[in-house]
């Protein structure tokens, strides 16, 4: 049984991957209390002792405001931590999966969807951190994959962490009768975290390289929120009361474009459900709709 170490293993993605694949692999799902990735000696010592076959590096600080307010801390985790893990992987001969982000393109003036070969122009600190790691990994490792995730969504599961995501947040807001603000000028892929986990395991059989990873979606965030409310059976008048079109941050002149082109991944046999289909399937799987 091959051993997988997952940093960020207590998080939204990591906890589900560990739960899904613990019968096929020996999985060490590590949280920040288990391993401080900013401590180079600790990272090297742990990985040398465990001798994993794979390391999935999912630890990171994605919160935009935190990254702005604490840029040194964010860089220590998002950049230094990733490079320490990569060096340890090289030392022990482990294959590394580095989880990157769609936010590499939030500063691009070109229209998406973006391909892996397109020039990344990150605006946010998190995207800049991820790009720096992507650029430095080839100097450290040969055997690695970079996966650029879309935005993940999912529902609560026993023993797993729930993260901020469009599906669960929309359902909660509807239940609590709270207004939901969303822009018609924000475009990004949105993927079921469990479908991500299924396909992430398949990635381990693919050639090394960089892959855009997740569901294709051409609808705005506003349209997706409306779709979710319709799917869970809210009446039209209730949807109109709850859903507020908010274009204060993004507009026709300032569109947020984060869509990724997944043609390369599809050519290797990994195909995600489109976002709306993935949302429908998730709601059906959890018994929320029939």
Where do the language-model regions lie?
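N-terminal Rossmann NAD(P)H-binding glycine-rich loop of SDR-like oxidoreductase domains
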Residues: 3-20
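Adenosine-cofactor binding site in Rossmann-like domains, unifying the SAM/SAH pocket
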Residues: 26-45
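NAD(P)H-binding glycine-rich loop region in Rossmannoid oxidoreductase-like domains
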Residues: 40-77
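NAD(P)-cofactor binding segment of oxidoreductase domains
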Residues: 69-97
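Catalytic helix-loop patch of NAD(P)-dependent Rossmann-fold dehydrogenases
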Residues: 76, 80-84, 104-147, 153, ...
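NAD(P)-dependent short-chain dehydrogenase/reductase
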Residues: 136-188, 195
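Mid/C-terminal beta-alpha module of Rossmann-like enzyme folds, strongest
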Residues: 197-250, 290
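Conserved C-terminal active-site "lid" loop/helix of NAD(P)H-dependent oxidoreductases
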Residues: 220-226, 243-281, 286-290
